[in-house]
Amino acid sequence: MSYISMKQLLEAGVHFGHETKRWNPKFKRFIFAERNGIFIIDLQKTLKQIDRSFDYIKDLAERGGVILFVGTKKQAQEIVELEARRTGMPYVTSRWLGGMLTNFRTIRTRIDRLNELDDMFESGRVNDRPKAERIELAAERERLLRFVGGIRKMTRLPDAIFVVDPTKEVIAVQEANKLGIPVIALADTDSDPDVIDYIVPGNDDAIRSIQLITHRIGDLIVEARGGGEDVSGERVSPDNADIEAAEDGEEVDNAQLTSSQGRS
């Protein structure tokens, strides 16, 4: 029995690909037909790939593996954050910072800085600073929280990454490929299957499609672990998901994260 039924895939519109002018020829083997200028994805092949990909996720979760959830496009942000937090997994829903994987040591220094700022504000020590400095520190804290808050408990490189739209998240995929970290992806007809280790061919734009696949992955992880467990080892209730909608971040480099200028 498949993890997801054909009926569920059809109802969520997983079979609708991009316009025929937007496609990657390497994806051809997963395309069923063309209808009115739109590619139709072969859901029989999607089901087979779901079984293969979800078997891997289930096995990895049972072994205590860490999966980094990545989804920065607007329609994926809230869903990805919700499922990552429900399962206790790290996530990126603002812009992917170059080097998040390949230069993880530097990224960890930014996380350490965020923890330092949190301590300053929570302890009240920040009140000893001049007002202008407090404002700058608050802005820095907010930026760091937006860009690295979802990975703050990730003390090592993940065992795999799950990506919604690998074409948009090309840098994340490239970094994972370079380090030999398996890539699991919900990938549409404009994607290159050759850079994805575990592909779920399907609509990566429609909210219902993204939600179906991502939520089922979340269920698998929770079921495999008997409840979520975050990367710091604290238990996470599957129902404890007090999530605010993810904000649409801006692309920045590490220097901008500590700058007092820019978006806050």
Curated annotation (Swiss-Prot):
Pfam families found in the cross-reference section: Ribosomal_S2
A single GO molecular function term of this UniProt record: structural constituent of ribosome
Lineage, uppermost ranks: Bacteria, Thermotogati, Deinococcota, Deinococci, Deinococcales
Family of the protein in this entry: Belongs to the universal ribosomal protein uS2 family.
InterPro entries documented for this protein: Ribosomal_uS2 (IPR001865), Ribosomal_uS2_bac/mit/plastid (IPR005706), Ribosomal_uS2_CS (IPR018130), Ribosomal_uS2_flav_dom_sf (IPR023591)
Tagged with keyword DNA-binding: no
Residues spanning the signal sequence: none
SUPFAM superfamilies xrefs: Ribosomal protein S2
One GO cellular component, as annotated: cytosolic small ribosomal subunit
Biased segments, Acidic residues type: 243-253
Taxonomic source organism: Deinococcus geothermalis (strain DSM 11300 / CIP 105573 / AG-3a)
Protein name in UniProt: Small ribosomal subunit protein uS2
Keyword Ribonucleoprotein: yes
Biased composition (Polar residues): 255-264
UniProtKB keywords: Ribonucleoprotein, Ribosomal protein
